[in-house]
Swiss-Prot record:
Taxonomy of the source species: Eukaryota, Viridiplantae, Streptophyta, Embryophyta, Tracheophyta
UniProt key word Thylakoid: yes
Record has DNA-binding as a keyword: no
The protein's name: ATP synthase subunit alpha, chloroplastic
Assigned keywords, A-Z: ATP synthesis, ATP-binding, CF(1), Chloroplast, Hydrogen ion transport, Ion transport, Membrane, Nucleotide-binding, Plastid, Thylakoid, Translocase, Transport
PANTHER family noted in UniProt: ATP SYNTHASE SUBUNIT ALPHA, MITOCHONDRIAL (PTHR48082:SF2)
């Protein structure tokens, strides 16, 4: 029989006592009263905070939005089909946050920043709150650098600056997404990080956009956040905030970012669905009372940071869909009042074959020429005035039978200027190409051409200019000014190419 020494026993007991941990873990637990339509009513959870994440037994996560006297209303970030009445719910003590890192570039993620492109996990060491406060007044400065879209109509007449919020608004099928995606394609080589947020769109449309980005090499500097039409309303509501958090990560690291919300009408509809199911009182068009705050707290996160914070920027291009051109509906007026200008796309222009279908008359940028290089200011000043006069004359000319020569000339010039603004999709132009194109139009060099020839002439002319007169692009790029030397080179190129073009057309 083994001798047991009492000292050994006592030392083992002492060791066990030392290792004993008296930690008490307290959980805030509740019980599901009712679940359905993406909403759960929970009894208990007495100390839960508004916006806190709650975890259900099956692993589904929800957000506590309604804190009522006898229950908590939570929205689910999933279908919630396996949650049962009477099951327990745990408060996590956290609010929604996402991992962030440079590795997100080139990836497609959902509203919880989880990859959905089948390319594996995304490494990330930092995280950011989905709902971060916007920069304050002292943290900002006014926008002064141009954010080129590559579209002549916008860059010349409705210029966008880095840190600006410019609304893209129009009916369905007027080319809103095309304007937004072309802007992303034009950021190639500009050192701008782009975030494209697709909210409630068809999965096929999102796939098409991602395909375009991949073909044109734009995915290298772009993150796509997608919640398609079959996603729960909660995730469609969160997607824009996730996109903003990813863009902010780069903005606070002294980089320039561009974020596109496509589109905020669908986010508002998802939020309306959640609010009505939570039994919040409906307001105008059945939207809840805080739908303005929904968009204002999102769009206020776009900013041009002060020099103390590194001068990073976040430019936001929110998209809003109108019904039959009604800009005075609830969501359009809300977003117009929050943003620094709007680019209005009209169905009439689109149907008339003017693409991009931008209605220059009612589109505006509140940053204005501060967001243009000097060369663009020099040539584009005349363009908006001439187009406005043309629109007025055109309306008048429909009723007048005999017009004097000056009026006929002005109408002819206006029609050619309108042709000059037409562009193919996914073919953004550099600023020097735009300057050359506008100069050709406003100085009457295209007046000798037939209207049908103008677009072809300009496409060939831009190629001719790049190939034969590289000095012109050098001057504009280096000095940002349309100098006398640049004008001489451009005039030469126009005359040479016009001669060639007319000879070709005669054959």
């Amino acid at each position: 029989m083994v001798n047991i020494r009492p000292e050994e026993i006592s030392s083992v007991i002492f060791r066990q006592i030392e290792q004993y941990n008296q930690e008490v873990r307290v959980f805030n637990i509740g019980t599901v009263l009712q679940v359905g339509d993406g909403i759960a009513r929970i009894y208990g959870l007495n100390e839960v905070m508004a916006g806190e994440l709650v975890e259900f037994e099956d692993g589904t996560v929800g957000i506590a939005l309604n804190l009522e006297s006898n229950n908590v209303g939570a929205v689910l970030m999933g279908d919630g089909l396996t949650i049962q009445e009477g099951s327990s719910v745990k408060a996590t003590g956290k609010i929604a946050q996402i991992p962030v890192s440079d590795a997100y570039l080139g990836r497609v993620v959902n509203a919880l920043a989880q990859p959905i492109d089948g390319k594996g996990q995304i490494p990330a060491s930092e995280s950011r709150l989905i709902e971060s406060p916007a920069p304050g007044i002292i943290s900002r400065r006014s926008a002064y650098e141009p954010m080129q879209t590559g579209l002549i109509a916008i860059d010349s007449m409705i210029p966008i600056g880095r840190g600006q919020r410019e609304l893209i608004i129009g009916d369905r099928q007027t080319g809103k997404t095309a304007v937004a995606t072309d802007t992303i394609l034009n950021q190639k080589g500009q050192n701008v990080i782009c975030v494209y947020v697709a909210i409630g769109q068809k999965a096929s449309s999102v796939a098409q956009v991602v395909n375009t980005f991949e073909e044109q090499g734009a995915m290298e500097y772009t993150i796509v956040v997608a919640e398609t039409a079959n996603s729960p309303a909660t995730l469609q509501y969160l997607a824009p905030y996730t996109g903003a958090a990813l863009a902010e990560y780069f903005m606070y690291r002294q980089q320039h970012t561009l974020i596109i919300y496509d589109d905020l009408s669908k986010q508002a509809q998802a939020y309306r669905q959640m609010s009505l199911l939570l039994r919040r009182p409906p307001g105008r068009e059945a939207y809840p009372g805080d739908v303005f705050y929904l968009h204002s707290r999102l769009l206020e996160r776009a900013a041009k940071l002060s020099s103390q914070l590194g001068e990073g920027s976040m430019t936001a291009l929110p998209v809003v869909e109108t019904q039959a051109g009604d800009v005075s509906a609830y969501i359009p007026t809300n977003v117009i009042s929050i943003t620094d200008g709007q680019t209005f796309l009209s169905a009439d222009s689109s149907n008339a074959g003017i693409r991009p279908a931008i209605n220059v008359g009612i589109s505006v940028s509140r940053v204005g020429s501060a967001a243009q290089i000097k060369a663009m200011k020099q040539v584009a000043g005349k363009l908006k005035l001439e187009l406005a006069q043309f629109a007025e004359l055109e309306a008048f000319a429909q009723f007048a039978s005999d017009l004097d020569k000056a009026t006929q000339n002005q109408l002819a010039r206006g029609q050619r200027l309108r042709e000059l603004l037409k562009q193919s999709q996914s073919a953004p132009l550099t600023v020097e190409e735009q300057v050359a194109t506008i100069y050709t139009g406003v100085n009457g060099y295209s007046d000798i051409l037939e209207i049908g020839q103008v677009k072809k002439f300009l496409v060939q002319f831009r190629e001719y200019l790049i190939t034969n007169k590289p000095k012109f692009a050098e001057i504009i790029c280096s000095t940002k000014v349309f100098t006398e030397q640049a004008e001489i080179i451009l005039k030469e190129a126009i005359e040479e190419h016009t001669e060639l073009f007319l000879l070709q057309e005669q054959k």
